[in-house]
Structures are given as structure tokens and as C-alpha cells.
Regions:
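Hinge/lid segment of periplasmic solute-binding proteins
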Residues: 113-165, 219-222, 303-305, 375-380, ...
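C-terminal capping/gating helix-and-loop segments adjacent to ligand/active sites or protein-protein/ligand interfaces
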Residues: 383-433
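Extracytoplasmic "Venus flytrap"/periplasmic binding protein-like
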Residues: 70-142, 177-179, 278, 285-286, ...
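Extracytoplasmic/periplasmic substrate-recognition and gating elements
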Residues: 46, 73, 178, 258-263, ...
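Short, low-complexity disordered leader/linker segments with a strong preference
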Residues: 1-50, 73, 428-431, 435-443
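Glycine-centered hinge/linker elements that transmit conformational signals in sensory
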Residues: 195-198, 238-268
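Periplasmic solute-binding protein
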Residues: 116-123, 146-183, 212-238, 320-328, ...
Length: 443
């Protein structure tokens, strides 16, 4: 899948905290969120120039430039200057934050979901809540978890740009060779564990499943659906304290530990990079991954299937790592209005189908199902595309975007890694991660 980044970008967030703080107090001229147009009235016919940092590589940038030109043609009073904004998507947060200080930030930019809270609390974003709540926008067609990511302290700072989710991908040949029935949409985690054990063949060096123990966010976010399905929480309601070390969190990690240590059915990847190629090659029977794998699955001609995640107590809840188009405030009612209008056009059913689906991503809206672009996309990336689209309904809550999540994720990843390699108990490791995360979360 040709997405700009999966599963989660966290590195850049550590380096820009001071810039964001400086931007909040620099007096650079941008007004607080939602202030544009408080007294003045937006004139949709006024000449306006807006800047859009897409955060995309060359192929995607060209596609988006074409859409901007199309909008310009239909709205000749609006000039949209489009560029990637930075050399890589990871660098965008640093660039935007520096722009807050110098007054050179854009009107619209791509942002990883992990940056949402930091940007939303900078004092430089628009609040477009009133706009997205208009009936014609059909805001609820976008998955709830993605909408929540774009909402900071009750303010809607933008519109989701990309949605995804984690599902179960299985290699049909490995199942056929072992004489094991394929996974079904109503599988429990006990079904998953039993199948993984049957599929593991030490003589042939085939594992039933895999898990990253690199300690990265790839390690961490795979635990969260199991925690949620058990009824647990990642953070306290105010986002200031860890809650993952609850009885539910311990039970979720103990389940994975049983597969890794007791069953020895789990390949432990030290790098994040090995388990997918091993799955393609038939050395791993099942992996937990997302629609970004569809391109490689097609390219490698893998015979595979996709189901929702297995469930605890019938709950197939999964997780998403949505990214966001963030709209910025320049204390200019016409710039704010034009930016909002363009953003709603860009993320409409008709236009998103020509962007995300054309680029191989999941559609942003449920209403895109059945469009010609959707039909082509589903056929091009069969059999996995439709199940991953359907799995969006199992995204019930957002992954945290609080500033301290980046640091917390590192400690949780280290805890999971230790437990799955037999170096600690789930309780001790998660308690230690919670303690280590306290300062980062209490900001």
C-alpha cells in the first residue's frame, strides 16, 4: 500500500515541543483557534491565496496538485499554492512549528495523528466544528476514531486525511499445507491461539504468527485492541495518567506471552521489518497488519485472506492510525473561509474517491462504497480491500494523541518486548512502564 507512513510517526514529536511552546507565546500575529471571523463575515468571492503543505512524495503530490488546479478553475478567486512542505512527511511538524514562530506557517497541512493534540493546543489552528456539523458535510460518514483524532479539546482542527485499521491477514497456502481451516470473521483469540499452535512447524521453521519486539510503536499499538477488547483503557480520562497497567492490560499481555513463551508459536521480530516478508514467503501463517500491506501482497502474488481481529467476549474492536489535514488560523476571515471550503471539497465523497482510492488507500467515507473508483480499487486489491474497508466499523476509539504518548509508547514497547522474550512478568513490566511514563504524561 502506497501510504506515506505506517503505522505511526512519533520521532519528530520529541524535537518540537519547545518550538510549539515558543509559538504559543511568540505574538506572531495568529489568533487563537476559532477566532477568525468572530466579527467579520467571510466573502466567498473575495480574492484569496492559501498555502497547502501536502506532506506527500512526488507521485501523490502530483495528484493533489491536479486537484488543487481543478478547484482553482472552479473558484478563480482562490489561488492555492501547493508543495510537500518538507523533504519528508516526518519533517513537517518541525517545519510547521518553526513557521508558528516566524509567521510562515501554511493554511493547510498534512499531519500524523500523533501530532494532533500538540498542533491543536498551539493556538494556531482553526476550529471548523460548525462547518463539519452542517448536514451536507455528512461528518459521520468518516470513522468515529478518525473524527476523534481531528478533535482537540472539543475543537475540530481539520478533517481526517487517511484512515486505516489492523486486521488479521492469513496465508492460505500455509493453512492448506497444514490442513487447518481458514480464520473466520467470528474467531475468538482462543481460536487464533489454537490455530497458531497447529500451524507452527519447528522442522520447517514455520511459525503460526508473529509480533514485533523492537520496542517501537509497532510493538505497542498491536497490544491496544486486546486491551480495549478486555475492557481496559490506555490512559485515564484526562489523559494525564497511565491506565494500561490495569488487570485488563495484564491479561491482554499475558495472552500474548502465552503464545510466545508457552506455545512458541510466535515469531519475534527484533526489527519490525522481517515478519511481513516472512509471511509473504510462507514462513509465517498469520500476521496482524493493515491495508498498507495490500500492495506488497498483490506484488508478491500471495494467496491470502483478511478477517477482522479475533475477539475477546465477541468484541472485534480494532485500532486505526488516521492522519489529518489540519487547518491553520491567520486571523483573516477570508483565508479561513477559503481554506475550510477547499478542505471540505477535498474530503467530500466525490473528490476523496479520486485521491485516496486512486492512490491505493482506504476510502475516507463509508458513502464511497459503490462508486466507480471504489469498485476499481476493490478489484485491484482483492481479496483484502473490501474486508479492510468493512473493518473500519470496528474502529471504536482513537489512539491517544496527547503529547506524552510518544514517550509512553516507547516504555510500553520496551515492556512488551521484555515480556514476550521471557525477561519480565506482564504485571511488573507494565507497572514499570506506567511509572516511567508519569512525567511525560503529566504535562
Amino acid at each position: 500500500m502506497k501510504t506515506v507512513s505506517r503505522p505511526f510517526a512519533t520521532v519528530a514529536a520529541l524535537s518540537v515541543g519547545s518550538l510549539l511552546l515558543a509559538a504559543c507565546t511568540s505574538g506572531s500575529g495568529a489568533a487563537p483557534s476559532g477566532s477568525s471571523g468572530a466579527k467579520a463575515v467571510y466573502d466567498p468571492k473575495a480574492p484569496v491565496s492559501i498555502t497547502w503543505w501536502t506532506g506527500q512524495t512526488a507521485e501523490a503530490e502530483k495528484l493533489l496538485e491536479g486537484l488543487a488546479a481543478e478547484y482553482n478553475k472552479a473558484h478563480p478567486n482562490v489561488t492555492i499554492t501547493t508543495s510537500p512542505g518538507a523533504s519528508t512527511t516526518d519533517d513537517l511538524l518541525q517545519k510547521v512549528s518553526a513557521g508558528f514562530v516566524s509567521g510562515t506557517y501554511p493554511d493547510l497541512s498534512y499531519a500524523f495523528g500523533s501530532w494532533a493534540t500538540q498542533l491543536g493546543q498551539s493556538g494556531h489552528t482553526l476550529d471548523i466544528k460548525a462547518a463539519v456539523e452542517k448536514p451536507e458535510v455528512n461528518w459521520t460518514e468518516i470513522p468515529a476514531g478518525a473524527r476523534a483524532t481531528a478533535t482537540v479539546d472539543g475543537k475540530v482542527i481539520g478533517v481526517p486525511a487517511l484512515v486505516d485499521n489492523l486486521g488479521l491477514i492469513y496465508n492460505k497456502k500455509v493453512f492448506d499445507d497444514a490442513g487447518v481451516a481458514y480464520p473466520t470473521a467470528d474467531w475468538s483469540w482462543d481460536d487464533f491461539r489454537a490455530a497458531a499452535k497447529k500451524l507452527t512447524n519447528t522442522d520447517k521453521k514455520i511459525f503460526g504468527t508473529a509480533y514485533s519486539v523492537s520496542g517501537s510503536e509497532d510493538t505497542t499499538w498491536h497490544l491496544w485492541p486486546l486491551l480495549w477488547q478486555k475492557g481496559g483503557k490506555i490512559l485515564s480520562d484526562d489523559g494525564k495518567k497511565a491506565a494500561f497497567n490495569s488487570d485488563q492490560g495484564v491479561a491482554a499481555l499475558d495472552f500474548l506471552r502465552g503464545m510466545a513463551i508457552d506455545d512458541k508459536s510466535m515469531y519475534l521480530d527484533q526489527t519490525d521489518e522481517k515478519y511481513a516478508p516472512l509471511f509473504y514467503d510462507g514462513r509465517i501463517a498469520m500476521i496482524i497488519s493493515g491495508p498498507w500491506s495490500l500492495f506488497d501482497l498483490k506484488d508478491r502474488k500471495v494467496s491470502y485472506g483478511v478477517t477482522p481481529l479475533p475477539a475477546f467476549a465477541g468484541d472485534h474492536q480494532t485500532i486505526s492510525g488516521p492522519d489529518v489535514w489540519v487547518a491553520y488560523d491567520h486571523s483573516d476571515v477570508n483565508r479561513a473561509g477559503a481554506t475550510t471550503d477547499f478542505l471540505l471539497w477535498l474530503t467530500s465523497k466525490e473528490i476523496d474517491a479520486r485521491w485516496n482510492l486512486a492512490y491505493g488507500n482506504l476510502p475516507l467515507r463509508s458513502s464511497e462504497e459503490g462508486t466507480p473508483e471504489f469498485v476499481k480499487w476493490a478489484a485491484d486489491y482483492a481479496p483484502g480491500a473490501q474486508p479492510f474497508f468493512d473493518n473500519l466499523q470496528n474502529v471504536k476509539q482513537p489512539r491517544p494523541t496527547v503529547p506524552g504518548y510518544t514517550e509512553m509508547s516507547k516504555f510500553v514497547g520496551q515492556a512488551i518486548s521484555k515480556v514476550l522474550q521471557g525477561a519480565a512478568t506482564s504485571k511488573d513490566a507494565l507497572d514499570q512502564a506506567a511509572s516511567q511514563s508519569a512525567d511525560a504524561l503529566d504535562q
